[in-house]
Amino acid sequence: MAYPLPLVLCFALVVAQVWGSTTPPTGTSEPPDVQTVEPTEDDILQNEADNQENVLSQLLGDYDKVKAVSEGSDCQCKCVVRPLGRDACQRINQGASRKEDFYTVETITSGSSCKCACVAPPSAVNPCEGDFRLQKLREADSRDLKLSTIIDLLEGAFYGLDLLKLHSVTTKLVGRVDKLEEEVSKNLTKENEQIKEDVEEIRTELNKRGKENCSDNTLESMPDIRSALQRDAAAAYAHPEYEERFLQEETVSQQINSIELLRTQPLVPPAAMKPQRPLQRQVHLRGRLASKPTVIRGITYYKAKVSEEENDIEEQHDELFSGDSGVDLLIEDQLLRQEDLLTSATRRPATTRHTAAVTTDASIQAAASSSEPAQASASASSFVEPAPQASDRELLATPQTTTVFPEPTEVMPSTQVSPTTVAHTAVQPLPAMVPGDIFVEALPLVPLLPDTVGTDMPEEEGTAGQEATSAGPILSPEEEDDIRNVIGRCKDTLSTITGPTTQNTYGRNEGAWMKDPLAKDDRIYVTNYYYGNTLVEFRNLENFKQGRWSNSYKLPYSWIGTGHVVYNGAFYYNRAFTRNIIKYDLKQRYVAAWAMLHDVAYEEATPWRWQGHSDVDFAVDENGLWLIYPALDDEGFNQEVIVLSKLNAVDLSTQKETTWRTGLRRNFYGNCFVICGVLYAVDSYNQRNANISYAFDTHTNTQIVPRLLFENEYSYTTQIDYNPKDRLLYAWDNGHQVTYHVIFAY
């Protein structure tokens, strides 16, 4: 035992000497000639790489801070924490604590109706908490701790973390990464430009050298190359299969000569053939190709094409007017033009079909005869842009204009058409060029609106054009984003709700399933049970029936109830046990908006059983997003009433002008939904034969008792939501997903 002691002492002396030689004395300073130099980009990047842990600690340092939670409008809270010292916490962990080893958390409030609470994580009041829990986890195997103890330790480690703050920290980190990517991309672009310049210089240098050194040699070797190519071609085309392949690429005259030669060549074996004959023929053909290869092929090709067009003009004429060709492209073009003009969707593709016929016929007549140039040019211009008035008069003044239309006699007495109605200007000149029976057969498909026809007075044509353009809804850019332009308009009064149609059986007794009315696809979103934090997505109804989910979203905050909706790519729900409503962006996967309902009558102690409806219920109809929740009636005797409010889908704000206090009372109805601005409520959720016993119209501020039959097929309906895109009610009935068709009175 005495031998290792001198070694230890020697090692200590060596370490002390090395440390003393490497560390400068404390009283010395840097020499005056050493100046501070600005760091370069490499130094900055190296410092960033070395200080990664420091950056993370700076960003995550406020996790251990104490948080104050306040409730009330004029409430101000402040938390004062006196934590333990590190020596004190070590004494507590060792079991030798003193009287002065304690921490305090004080709450300072200001305001009349103020409630404050201080949330202090263990790491904020006890600096040794993290080391203590880490030591316990390391000793878990030796002490044989139970799983519950480990879970408690992990919960304590995550206690006090705020996911919104975590999102902000992640955003900061992403910002730093974006800056790094920008710098790297700039450097890469500079390097790529430099490399391109170097490559161009090398290419130009090589081209110069190649031209100087190899031009004479190339010219001298050209005859040798040509002779070698001719010999190779003669040897290759000596076989019959190669000769056929060569003849297919020759012109018509060469094919005729080759066919005559081929009739005699198969009778001779390949070994008996003389090499001089195909060699002479090959040289002769190569000479013809070198002289005019392109001219021969081009002339032959264009002559054949033009002759076919001249012979088939009548067939194309019939095909175009029969609607069998050239229609799809014009229909697509006409639909795009209708969207640009913002007209209503009352025109049919038949209008475009006749437009295509007129345009084609006008071009054919212009090519066939030059006696009517004004008519052809006017008809063609009426398809591309609004035609002049004089051209329209010339087109419509033909004798057949008033005799071909036997049915719509109230439309055709006018001989002048507004220049702004492009499609109708192209339709009406049609009888002057097409036989009457063809147009009369297709006439019922053409919708002719009375608003689009002008009068007999020339000075009123401008007014008629204005009326024609105003026949459809002229929408402003702000109104184009309205939901009614995507999913349609209201169908007026609700008349009947059909019986339920069971689509699937999935999940627990309570839950909700929904579709996004503004989405182009048919994705289905499911929340299983009335409490949780996982939203499941299915690609379509068939995948939902098969149980094949395509995506899942782990929400940062749990939801409660079944009154959620998916609207315009976001999930709207009520945060569990709070007055908060949340908008969660499904594409970006983050909380896009957050709001608090200050007047909601929220039950602090919510029982863990289904109440028959959700306290906070979202709804979607043709007008947008709605919110239904209980509140205290300030105008009455502080009784609870059900409030219906139009919700801003962007920031979750409400307006007093679009908020109504209904006659519903909590726990006196089953489920509710909104259709065309009217709130409907079902009287029971657990009776098979229920009724829609209440309706509140936001347009007239009136309430009625409609007494419409509503069937709860499985006698336990926990969700009813209206989808304005499908005109269906989506319901969750005792683990069954059912739909109801909505029938309107008008």
Curated annotation (Swiss-Prot):
Glycans are attached at residues 187, 213, 691. SMART domains: OLF. Disulfide bonds join 490-676. Residues 1-20 form the signal peptide. Pfam families: OLF. Residues 346-382 have a biased composition (Low complexity). One of its GO terms (cellular component) is extracellular region. Residues 43-68, 179-213 form a coiled coil. Residues 346-393, 454-479 are annotated as: Disordered. The keyword Electron transport does not apply. Broadly expressed. Within the eye, present in ganglion cells, inner nuclear layers, inner segment of photoreceptor layers and retinal pigment epithelium (at protein level). It is found in: Secreted. The keyword Signal applies. One of its GO terms (molecular function) is extracellular matrix binding. PROSITE patterns: OLF (PS51132). O-glycosylated and N-glycosylated. Its main location: secreted. Keywords: Coiled coil, Disulfide bond, Glycoprotein, Secreted, Signal. Residues 489-746 form the Olfactomedin-like domain. GO terms for biological process: extracellular matrix organization. Homodimer. Binds to heparin and chondroitin sulfate E. This is Olfactomedin-like protein 2B. The lineage of its organism: Eukaryota, Metazoa, Chordata, Craniata, Vertebrata.
